[in-house]
Structures are given as structure tokens and as C-alpha cells.
């Protein structure tokens, strides 16, 4: 790239664009009609770096929180993807669709005039807790190496296996019956584990009530500790690139273990250090406050009685420990 081309590109970047040097997370309020991949492409252009990813797909019709990582923070995304999610949704009873949402062709219509709030509450209770959920056939799940939605569009009858999910909360916050009694719209709020399909919940609720059902609106309001109230629109991001620095994000996601300089160096080389005594992932923080790695206590191979902290994800480049000064009793 010529110098003039680089200067032209830099002038187009918003204030605060990180380029390829800084790393962090961006909380984006995804608009309807955009795919998650579309959002990643937009953030790439605004950030000035190609290394961008997201922590969990949102369907094009859905809006709300999409956690996007850039540069080294993309390594955090796997851990974020596995966290619980919160959604606001609207379910229409009385109509089933191919996709289990409003974007698919109608499969069947059945009168919902026999639906009552009491029956809805009972069916919702049965769909709360630990479930074996069959994902929507029109999904990004791979079947023999090909996305399920590609197979459905090619005319195949795709049947996906049930998967364990947990719906921690399934609350009906609004109930609206059509004047002619043909459909009932339910506004709901759902807290669930990663991998739960809200479209499938709408479908299963409709089946339980013998009316059929599909999703007409979906908004993700939380991913783990992150809230959509802290998210920015793509329009705002184009003016000022707002992000959370990698070390701050990691320290907010996991318990923090403060390291000595020697421990930080060991982890930067991928070596184990003394066990943390904490269950699960821990953010290992160097003396200067930067997060060197995410670590987890594990048994040593061949010595199951000995635990040590193993680096699962290393962010810092390999660095030798700083030489001790004479004031610290070191040798010159």
C-alpha cells in the first residue's frame, strides 16, 4: 500500500480506531436485517484490522447484543460464547413456519382460540429447566460438513439430534389475543445457556399448546456479564470507535490472579505456574496490570495428586523476567 493510500485510509477511520496494535471487545447493538458476519465486516473496516470475530451468532431478523473481539481479544471469544444469554422475544401461537420464525414460509395455521393464560403458564413451566432441545432445522449447525440451512434450502428433510440445554427463566410478560381469536402473541423473557434456540422454544411451546408457534421478534439483551445497555450502534461506532481493552475485559470476565514478574514470564512461554486454588478459568495479571493469560488448575501428567495452573490462552508475547536491581538484592 502506498503512503498516500495509507493516509487516505487512516483519514476514513473513526476516532479511537485501534488498527492492528490494540486489542479489545466492542459491544454492538446489531440492527435487524444484518447478519452477524455483516457486523464483523463493518467492524473490520472501522477498526482498521482484519482480525475480528464475534461471540455467538444472531439471526438476521434479531437485534441486540453482539460481542465482537478484535486482534488478540478474539482469543477471548470462545470463553464468552459459552456464557449464559438473555433474550426478549415475541411468540405467535396459531402459525407454524419452516424456519420457526417470521422469515420462513407458513407450514400450518391452527386456531388459538382455546389458549388461556393458565395453559400457557403450564406449558412454559414444562419448557423451563434442563431440556433436551431439537434445534431448528434452518440453523448453522453442520450436518456431514454442510450447514443445516443449506440442506433445507436444497429440499432435504433435515432432522437434527436433540441437545441438552438449560432454560433458567422463561417468563411471559405480555399476552395479546387477536380480535378474531386466530392467534395469540406472547412477549417473553428468557435466560438460558449457550446453544439454546429461542426459535425452537417458540416451536415447542406451540406444539405443547396444539396450535403451532413461531418467533416474530427477538432481541438479545445480555451475554454473560455484558449488557445491551452498554452497547453502541454501528452508526455511533463509525464516528467514535468505543471498546473495552483486552485486560479490562478479561479481568471483568474471570477471577484475577496477580502474578510476580517471574510467573508472568513463565506463562508467556506457555509454562505452568503454582495452582490458583480456584475452580474454572482465571485471568493471570502481570505486575503492570496487563492480563498475560487465562489459566486453569489441572493435574500434572502422571501425577494426579499435584495441581498446577496451566495457561489455556496466552495473550502476551514470550518475555524473559526483568533482571533484579541491586536495590532488590540482585547482582549487576
PLM region descriptions:
Residues 45-48, 67, 157-202, 207-210:
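The conserved catalytic core of RNA pseudouridine synthases
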Residues 139, 143-168:
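Extended alpha-helical targeting/anchoring segments
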Residues 51-81, 137, 150:
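Glycine/acidic-rich beta-strand-loop module
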Residues 79-135:
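Acidic, low-complexity central loop/insert segments
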Residues 68, 89, 145, 201, ...:
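Residue-level signal for inorganic ion chemistry
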Residues 2-31, 37-54, 58, 62, ...:
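Accessory RNA 3′-end/elbow-binding domains used by RNA modification enzymes
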Residues 78-93, 158-172:
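Structural signature of FAD isoalloxazine-binding scaffolds in flavoprotein oxidoreductases
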Residues 140, 147, 152, 184-229:
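Pseudouridine synthase
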Amino acid at each position: 500500500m502506498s503512503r498516500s493510500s495509507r493516509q487516505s485510509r487512516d483519514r476514513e477511520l473513526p476516532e479511537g480506531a485501534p488498527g492492528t496494535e490494540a486489542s479489545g471487545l466492542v459491544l454492538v447493538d446489531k440492527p435487524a436485517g444484518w447478519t452477524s458476519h455483516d457486523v464483523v465486516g463493518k467492524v473490520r473496516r472501522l477498526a482498521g484490522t482484519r482480525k475480528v470475530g464475534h461471540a455467538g451468532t444472531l439471526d438476521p431478523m434479531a437485534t441486540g447484543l453482539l460481542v465482537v473481539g478484535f486482534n488478540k481479544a478474539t482469543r477471548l471469544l470462545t470463553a464468552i460464547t459459552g456464557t449464559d444469554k438473555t433474550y426478549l422475544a415475541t411468540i405467535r401461537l396459531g402459525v407454524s413456519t419452516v424456519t420457526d420464525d417470521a422469515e420462513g414460509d407458513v407450514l400450518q395455521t391452527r386456531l388459538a382460540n382455546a389458549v388461556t393464560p393458565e395453559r400457557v403458564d403450564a406449558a412454559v413451566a414444562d419448557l423451563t429447566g434442563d431440556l433436551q432441545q431439537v434445534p431448528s432445522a434452518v440453523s448453522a449447525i453442520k450436518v456431514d460438513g454442510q450447514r443445516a440451512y443449506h440442506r433445507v434450502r436444497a429440499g432435504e428433510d433435515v432432522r437434527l439430534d436433540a441437545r441438552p440445554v438449560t432454560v433458567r427463566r422463561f417468563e411471559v410478560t405480555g399476552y395479546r389475543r387477536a380480535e378474531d381469536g386466530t392467534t395469540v402473541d406472547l412477549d417473553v423473557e428468557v435466560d438460558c445457556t449457550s446453544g439454546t434456540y429461542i426459535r425452537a422454544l417458540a416451536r415447542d411451546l406451540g406444539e405443547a399448546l396444539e396450535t403451532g408457534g413461531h418467533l416474530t421478534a427477538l432481541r438479545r439483551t445480555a451475554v454473560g456479564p455484558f449488557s445491551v445497555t452498554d452497547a453502541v450502534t454501528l452508526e455511533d461506532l463509525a464516528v467514535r470507535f468505543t471498546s473495552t481493552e483486552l485486560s479490562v475485559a478479561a479481568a471483568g470476565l474471570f477471577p484475577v490472579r496477580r502474578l510476580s514478574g517471574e510467573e508472568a514470564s513463565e506463562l508467556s512461554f506457555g509454562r505452568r505456574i503454582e495452582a490458583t486454588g480456584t475452580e474454572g478459568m482465571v485471568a493471570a495479571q502481570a505486575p503492570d496490570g496487563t492480563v498475560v493469560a487465562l489459566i486453569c488448575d489441572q493435574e500434572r501428567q502422571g501425577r494426579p495428586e499435584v495441581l498446577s495452573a496451566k495457561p489455556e490462552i496466552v495473550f502476551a508475547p514470550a518475555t524473559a523476567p526483568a533482571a533484579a536491581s541491586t536495590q532488590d538484592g540482585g547482582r549487576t
